[in-house]
Design a protein with these regions (language model features):
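Alpha-helical transmembrane segments in inner-membrane proteins
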Residues: 1-318
Length: 318
């Protein structure tokens, strides 16, 4: 009873903080125009979607890899998504010259990325057996390679075309990709249901691979399905607001600090609430305190990067 009461108090506190962050974000409510209401409502929805996608995908990925320092973003999935998007847009503008369809492009990119990373699953499992420093070096090198190729292709483009492509290439919290908001919401909602149903499987995988196999779990099959879902969640979040290297890492590790529990349903809910509060409250402070002179992604990357090195230092000291 004390265990349940503790989590109930935690949920109530996080929900109150989330409501407070929303009220601060919409304040003053009576002075907002219809356009401002619509824009802020869309942003609130996107903040919730990003918190859901990032929190669930990162915690699930860390369970699969048995490593709390690795995230889909650090492995370069976001950078690879940007590279695919750049290649697709360059190919369309140079060869096909068709009218742009953001939804079709988004679906094609999701399909390509899913197929690519599922094909590399065998190599990924081999990589996870290596030393953490080696893994990080490989991942940083791959991420840098993907970003440099993307930049090189963009430099070769006509300046006018390049300017037109910026909105679709690099979304942000200030400039949301609302053209795919509806389909992105459906994908994230469907995958959220999928991961909550797989939460018990993740609880078993948390006991490590050998134990899961002894308990009769088809580890290979479950890992493939979960990895596919993680790639889709990460890609959808990247398409909505752009790449955020350390947001998932920050969410997951703050959740582990807040909740001393292995059950993934509980971890998912706390991570979603923490992510939503962080994004909403952070954006409200940036608009009111910093007068939009900085971006929320800068704060997220700074805090997340600092937390990453602190935890890495603490691990090295053990």
């Amino acid at each position: 009873m004390q265990f349940k009461s503790k989590h109930t108090k935690l949920f109530c506190l996080l929900i109150i903080l989330a409501i407070g962050a929303c009220l601060l974000y919409f304040w003053p409510i009576t002075h907002l125009s219809a356009f401002a209401w619509k824009l802020r409502s869309q942003k609130i929805i996107v903040y919730l979607l990003v918190a859901i996608a990032t929190g669930i995908s990162t915690i699930s990925f860390q369970t699969l890899t048995e490593n709390r320092f690795l995230t889909p973003s650090i492995l370069g999935i976001e950078s690879f998504y940007v590279l695919l998007q750049t290649l697709l847009l360059v190919f369309e503008s140079k060869f096909l010259q068709l009218e742009k369809s953001p939804i079709l492009e988004f679906l094609v990119l999701l399909l390509l990325q899913s197929l690519f990373f599922l094909a590399l699953q065998g190599y990924l499992k081999t990589l996870m057996k290596q030393d953490l420093v080696f893994i990080l070096l490989i991942c940083l090198a791959l991420g840098s390679l993907f970003r440099n190729i993307s930049t090189f292709l963009q430099v070769l483009m006509d300046p006018n075309e390049y300017d037109k492509l910026q909105n679709s290439l690099f979304a942000s919290f200030q400039h949301l990709n609302t053209s795919i908001l509806a389909i992105g919401s459906l994908i994230i909602l469907a995958l959220t249901i999928f991961f909550f149903r797989k939460a018990v499987i993740l609880d078993v995988l948390h006991l490590q691979r050998e134990t899961a196999q002894i308990l009769g779990l088809d580890v290979e099959k479950e890992q493939k399905e979960l990895l596919w879902g993680i790639v889709l969640l990460t890609s959808t979040a990247t398409a909505l607001v752009g790449p955020m290297a350390f947001f998932g890492f920050m969410l997951a590790n703050l959740t582990y600090l807040i909740v001393k529990d292995y059950r993934h349903k509980l971890l998912f809910v706390v991570a979603i609430l923490v992510g939503f509060i962080s994004l909403t409250l952070g954006q409200a402070l940036i608009e009111r305190v910093f007068a939009l002179e900085i971006r929320i992604s800068m704060i997220i990357e700074s805090v997340g990067g600092l937390l990453f090195f602190i935890l890495l230092y603490r691990r090295a000291r053990r």
